[in-house]
C-alpha cells in the first residue's frame, strides 16, 4: 500500500515537472521569438551616424577665418580624443562602466546584478532603481535610438551595442561618448562643458574638474552647480565628485596620494566655477551673419526644395561650413569708423546712441559684399539691421536721382548730359499733372534758382525742380522701369508720384545694400551684379551643397553707364554737395541725399574698385539735428579710405562708342560765336555723348544787342553813338515769377528813350573834343575815337578771345569764371 502511494506521488511530480518544463520551454521559445522580433525591427547600425554629432553650422570670412556660429539652445564643441586628458577618460570609465575594457558592448554581470537589485527594490516598493547601461549602450541611445523607455528599446540597444563593438575600437567608442553626452546647462560634450563650467578647454582640466564633469551625466539637473539648490547646498555636487574620485582610486586609476590631495582641494574650495552667463543669442558679426544665413536658407529652398523645418535642422544641427564674402578686418574697421565718428553730433536715448548710421561696401564686379554694418554703438541681439533689412527701409532723397532720373534719361536717349533746362518753379501745366488739388510745386534746397543749367550741372548742384522737369520729360513709366531695373522697391503709391521718382521720397524706401548694388552699375559697363554674401556651403562630409553663381543683368548701355559715372564727379567736386567723400588720389564718384525734413541723410557712390552706401538717421524717423548729407559723404570717405589702402590708382574706362563734342553749357546745343562771348566767360565745353545723340541745333539762348552802356537799356536812335556798346545776353521770353541767379545777364527789355547826359559826362566830352582840335587835324577821327576809354574796345578783345577759343578743340569742362554758391549741405 505504501509503495503504491509513493509511486503515485512520483508520477504526479514528474507530470507537474514536465508541465512546468513545457511551460518554461514554450515561454522561452516565445520570449526568444519576441526578442528576435525586437532585434529584427531595430534600425540598421550606421557607424557614421554614431561618429557624427549634431553641431551648429559655422560661418567663415573671406579668408577662411572663423567668424560666427549659428545660435542654438545647446552648444557642442567636438574635441579630438587625443586632446581629452586621461583623468577625464578614466573618470568616466570608473563611474559609468568600470568593466568597459572587458565587455563586448553589454556587461552581463552588471546587468544581472542590477535586475536582481531592481526586482528586490520593487518588492520592497522602493522607487530607487539602478541602470545597467554600458558606455557603449549610452552612446547607441544618444546617437541612434530614441529616448523611449521600453523593453523593446532596451533589447535593441543591447543588440546594437554588441554590433558596434565589432566595428569600433574602445577609444573610438569612448571618444564618441564624450562628445555626445549631455552635461547640464546648454553643454553637449566635454569641451562645451569645460567652457561652460570652468571657462577653459578640456585639455586644461584638473583632476577634481575631471571628476566633477564625469559625475554630472547621472543627473545633469541635480548636479548643476548654478542651480539654486546647489548654491544653497554645494555638497550635492561635491559628494558626487568625491564618489567619482573614490571609484577612480578603487579601479587603480589614481594613487592614494592623488585621492587625498583631490579631497583636500575640494575641501579647500578649489573647485571654482566660472561666472555663469545667460545663453546669448547674439552673433559676433550679426550685421553680416544674419543676412548671409538668410541667403543660404533661400538658396537651400530653391535648389533642394527643402521646407523651413528641414532647413532649420540642417543649419542648427548639420554642422555646415558657410564661407561668407565678409572681410573681417574691413568689417571691424568700418564698424569702428562708424562708432567713433565724432562729427555725428551724438547723444544717447534708452541706451542707444543717436543718430544711428549704417553702411554696405561691395565689390560690384563679382557681387561680393565685404562689409555690412547695421548700426553704431552697443546694440541688443538681433537689433534693427539698418543696412540690409527689408523691414528697415528709408527714403533715399536725392541719392535716387542718378538712378531714376539722370541715367534713365541718358540711356533712353530722351536727354543728354548737355541738355539744357531752366531752373525755375514748375509751370502749372506740369504741376497739375501730378496733383489732384493745387499744382505740384516742389522747391529747391536751399530755396535758390539758378536759371539756365544743363543736366550735368543740375546733378552736380542737386537741383530738385530740374529733376522733376526731367522725369516729366522722360515720363513716369520710364522712370519706374529704371527704378525696378536698379532694384529699388517701388510700390503702388510710388508709381503715381513724381516726388518719389525724381526726389527720392519713396513710400517705403531703400537701404544701403540696395543702393550699393545699384550704384555699382555705373562702374560696371551698365551691368547690375546681385549682392553675394557667401561663396560656398559645405556639409560635414566635405560635400559642396551650395556654390552660388554671380547673377547679373543689364540695366544701362555701357555708354549711358559711363556718362552717368562721369557726371557723378560733379557732386563730389568743390562746387558739388559732397566733396567730403574724396580721399587720397582715388577716383571717387557719388551723390548725396536728404529726405524731407532732414530725416534721412545719405551718400551713395563708387570707385573703380567698390561701391558703397552710407545712411544716417534716427530710428523713429525724426529730424537729424546738426548733421547733413555732407556728413554722410565724409563718413563714406572715411570708410572707403580704409578699403583702398595700397590699391593703385585706377580709372573706369570710357567705351570706344562714347563720342565727344563741343556744346554750349547754357542751351545744351551746338555753340555759336556768341557762346564764347557770354558775359561770365565762355560757355563752351566738351561733353560726352552716346553716338547719335550729339545735338544738331545751334545755341539760341545767347543773343547780341546794342545797349546804352550807361543806362543798360537797349540802344535806340536817341542813344549817343559813343554810349552804344554791343554785348551778349541771355534770352528769356517770359517772367518766371521769382528771381533767378542768371537774371542779371538777361537781355534788357527797356529801350533807351534819350535824354541829357549827366553834367560830368558833358564836361568830359567837351574837354575831349577841345583836346582833339589841338592835335594833328589830318588824323583820322576814327583813330581819335579809339583813344576814348568809353569806346567799345572790350569787344575787340572778346573777338580776339573768340578766335582763340575757336582753335581750342577741348575747352575745360568746369568754367572757373562762374560764380558758384557753396552748397555743401544742399541736396
From Swiss-Prot:
Its main location: membrane. It is a single-pass type II membrane protein. Keywords: Antibiotic resistance, Carboxypeptidase, Cell membrane, Cell shape, Cell wall biogenesis/degradation, Glycosyltransferase, Hydrolase, Membrane, Multifunctional enzyme, Peptidoglycan synthesis, Protease, Signal-anchor, Transferase, Transmembrane, Transmembrane helix. It is found in: Cell membrane. The active site is at residues 96, 398. Residues 755-827 are annotated as: Disordered. Its EC number is 2.4.99.28, 3.4.16.4. The chain crosses the membrane at residues 19-39. Pathway: Cell wall biogenesis; peptidoglycan biosynthesis. One of its GO terms (molecular function) is penicillin binding. Residues 40-827 are extracellular. One of its GO terms (cellular component) is plasma membrane. One of its GO terms (biological process) is regulation of cell shape. Residues 57-229 are annotated as: Transglycosylase. Residues 760-790, 818-827 have a biased composition (Basic and acidic residues). It comes from the Bacteria. Residues 791-817 have a biased composition (Low complexity). NCBIfam families: PBP_1a_fam. PANTHER family: BINDING PROTEIN TRANSPEPTIDASE, PUTATIVE-RELATED, PEPTIDOGLYCAN GLYCOSYLTRANSFERASE. In the N-terminal section; belongs to the glycosyltransferase 51 family. In the C-terminal section; belongs to the transpeptidase family. Cell wall formation. Synthesis of cross-linked peptidoglycan from the lipid intermediates. The enzyme has a penicillin-insensitive transglycosylase N-terminal domain (formation of linear glycan strands) and a penicillin-sensitive transpeptidase C-terminal domain (cross-linking of the peptide subunits). This is Penicillin-binding protein 1A. The lineage of its organism: Bacteria, Bacillati, Bacillota, Clostridia, Eubacteriales.
